[in-house]
Amino acid sequence: MHYIQRKDGRDLETVDEFTTAKEARAMLHEYRTADPSAVYYMSRRPCKHWKE
């Protein structure tokens, strides 16, 4: 799985998950365009609260 993480100041959260890296990269661009105030990046692991 591939995850998109959002980091804003001290806060970190997983915002989406994808089965392919290609799909995740395409959506990563969309997230970065829609919200330039935060840092978005891809990760192979979700944050610890993602599954709850």
Task: Give the location of each predicted region.
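Acidic phosphotransfer microenvironment of two-component signaling modules
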Residues: 22
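Short, mixed-charge low-complexity intrinsically disordered segments
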Residues: 12-15, 25, 29-52
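A short beta-strand micro-motif
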Residues: 1-8
